[in-house]
Amino acid sequence: MDRVVIVLSVLSVAASSQSILDQRRFSIAVSRVQHIHLLAQKYFSDFESSLQTEDQRQVNKIFLQDFCNSDDIISPIDKHDTQRSSVLKLLSISVRLIESWEFSSRFVTWSTFPRNQISHKLSELKTGIRMLIEANQDGAEVFSDSSTFQLAPYGNFYQSLGGDESLRRNYELLACFKKDMHKVETYLTVAKCRLSPEANCTL
């Protein structure tokens, strides 16, 4: 009987330690994506402010007719769908969104911020989320690497562009990047909240 109690105590301590570790990892991941999202908002705002009134009107009109490459990634359609999604699903979608930008982010004009640093920050964030996925996988729901896919690059943006076309593509990339980082921040925040039973995870 005493041996059973000891085993149960050890298992309880191990589970508690794992939960604390998960919370810490989630906190780091949320903090990192918040930083990236703030950068995305800043550079999108700076880019808009640098445009002439007519240029701003034109790129806005064009972008409304276009869509983000990552729209092909199946994700929750609204906040209620997000709240109903499992932690593992939210983490897996977040990885896919980040993967779609690891290469593309190198071709965005980031003002004074080095382009490769954004890509590096995304890679670090993806590594952290993958660790969370491994820690939260179980037999009931498994999202393996085979379920992920690489999106095609954003059109022909990597070719030499000039004039208005270059302006338009940079605007599109900044707008889509900001949108996708907002999604990742939301998904990670909800997933982190799920680890706290007493927390209110309402968006």
UniProtKB/Swiss-Prot annotation:
Zn(2+) binds at residues 35, 185. Residues 1-17 form the signal peptide. GO terms for cellular component: extracellular space. The modification Pyrrolidone carboxylic acid is found at residue 18. GO terms for biological process: animal organ development; growth hormone receptor signaling pathway; positive regulation of growth; positive regulation of receptor signaling pathway via JAK-STAT; response to nutrient levels. Keywords: Disulfide bond, Hormone, Metal-binding, Pyrrolidone carboxylic acid, Secreted, Signal, Zinc. SUPFAM superfamilies: 4-helical cytokines. It is found in: Secreted. Disulfide bonds join 68-176, 193-201. Pfam families: Hormone_1. GO terms for molecular function: growth hormone activity; growth hormone receptor binding; metal ion binding. It comes from the Eukaryota. PANTHER family: SOMATOTROPIN, SOMATOTROPIN,PROLACTIN. Belongs to the somatotropin/prolactin family. Growth hormone plays an important role in growth control and is involved in the regulation of several anabolic processes. Implicated as an osmoregulatory substance important for seawater adaptation. This is Somatotropin.
